[in-house]
Amino acid sequence: MFYDRAKIYVKGGDGGNGCIAMRREKYVPFGGPWGGDGGHGGDVTFIADEGLNTLQDFRYKKHFKAERGGHGMGKNMNGPAGEDLLVKVPTGTVVREAETGRLIADLLENGQQVVIAKGGRGGRGNVHFASSSNKAPRIAEKGEPGEELWLELELKVIADVGLIGFPNAGKSTFISMVSAAKPKIADYPFTTLVPNLGVVSAGEEGSFVLADIPGLVEGASQGVGLGHEFLRHTERTRLLIHVVDTAGTEGRDPVEDIKIINRELELYDPRLSTRPQIIAANKMDIIPLAEENLARLREEFGEQFEIYPISAATNQGLDKVIHRVAELLAQLPKIEPEQPEEDVMFEPEERFNIKRDIDGNWRVTGKEIERHVAMTYLEEDQSLERLQRIMKMMGLENGLVEAGVKVGDIVRIGDWEFEWSE
């Protein structure tokens, strides 16, 4: 099976915890704090690999987590950084955040790397919290949690030219005659169930990658047949070869076939309607009907498209098509990768949000406050006091009071619960 979609979970490594330690050595009076910092968590990085051509591996492994940073230790020793996790994906993979659809990366080049989930920073050891009023602080930070998110992966094959047309128009025969690709060929619809790629040599004019796009029928843009699954693979192409059954061996009108397929392309993505296209009028070896329909094709589309009579089965006319395609490709620009949207205007997030859960308890959300709570040693009184000061400076205490919190109420922040008291 050909898998071009996957949903996976990734998480950057958590930062290592900072250490609470005191220096206790002979001849060193008032040794003071000596706790080291935690190491930075590892990143989850995707790397494009041209040796891969499917997302099938992600059917069996869906969770990817980088190594956490090492914890700080006494004697002011810092923990080691966590190892980054490299995840190989096929070239042509588009990475989006599953919840929002936000584009994160479009990996087009072999070896291209993108950090998908950053590791958390290491927590600071208590050596950082010494002051004139607190020379032996029992304050340190736990490691910052690494970024985590669910991703939608979508593979769009990378080819210079796409072969489009109705089932049984002869696309698979075409690609098998001009390249080393060996698609399944049979006399029934939907023989081809996966996009087949082949490298085509045009002599001195160079070579190009050709993709046989299967499953295009009327209604494909709305999911009819297999077209909805494979139309995305036309997006990377720079030029389209529209293969049509000129002889009408399947009982269809070749003129209407071209109109239908082009309408489906435009409905799926209006940009495809402007993609350069040539018509390969196939099955010209079946006469006289093919010759009559060729004249109709030229009358209907001659001013809009270049039309080449061919017979893929007998190799008739294929060389002319290939050399013309190579000439056109030399004049066409490369398809640019999708770019993540950039915020034009900076809009600061609210520092926190307060709401009441269905059970009557309070829930506080916000990246900053949740990070502070996650990085606090709540079992240490001094660390807890520091967190309370931070909450007060952020305005959280006043916010809860204004929201109506009462003594004894439970306030949830992240994974922790606190009982409200005066």
UniProtKB/Swiss-Prot annotation:
Domain OBG-type G: 159-330
Keywords of the record: Cytoplasm, GTP-binding, Hydrolase, Magnesium, Metal-binding, Nucleotide-binding
Signal sequence residues: none
Short name of any one Pfam family annotated for the protein: GTP1_OBG
Cofactor: Mg(2+)
Residues binding Mg(2+): 172, 192
EC number of this enzyme: 3.6.5.-
Primary location group: cytoplasm
Domain OCT: start-end pairs: 344-422
One MF term in the entry's GO annotations: magnesium ion binding
GO cellular component: cytoplasm
UniProt subcellular location: Cytoplasm
Biological processes, Gene Ontology terms: ribosome biogenesis
Ranges where the Obg domain occurs: 1-158
Binding site residues for GTP: 165-172, 190-194, 212-215, 282-285, 311-313
UniProt entry tagged with the keyword GTP-binding: yes
InterPro entries referenced in this protein's UniProt entry, alphabetically: G_OBG (IPR031167), GTP-bd (IPR006073), GTP-bd_Obg/CgtA (IPR014100), GTP-bd_prot_GTP1/OBG_C_sf (IPR036346), GTP1-OBG_CS (IPR006074), GTP1_OBG_dom (IPR006169), GTP1_OBG_dom_sf (IPR036726), OBG_GTPase (IPR045086)
Source taxon at top rank: Bacteria
Oligomer and partners: Monomer.
Membership in a protein family: Belongs to the TRAFAC class OBG-HflX-like GTPase superfamily. OBG GTPase family.
PANTHER family: DEVELOPMENTALLY REGULATED GTP-BINDING PROTEIN-RELATED (PTHR11702), MITOCHONDRIAL RIBOSOME-ASSOCIATED GTPASE 2 (PTHR11702:SF31)
Physiological role: An essential GTPase which binds GTP, GDP and possibly (p)ppGpp with moderate affinity, with high nucleotide exchange rates and a fairly low GTP hydrolysis rate. Plays a role in control of the cell cycle, stress response, ribosome biogenesis and in those bacteria that undergo differentiation, in morphogenesis control.
Protein name per UniProt: GTPase Obg
Native species: Desulforamulus reducens (strain ATCC BAA-1160 / DSM 100696 / MI-1) (Desulfotomaculum reducens)
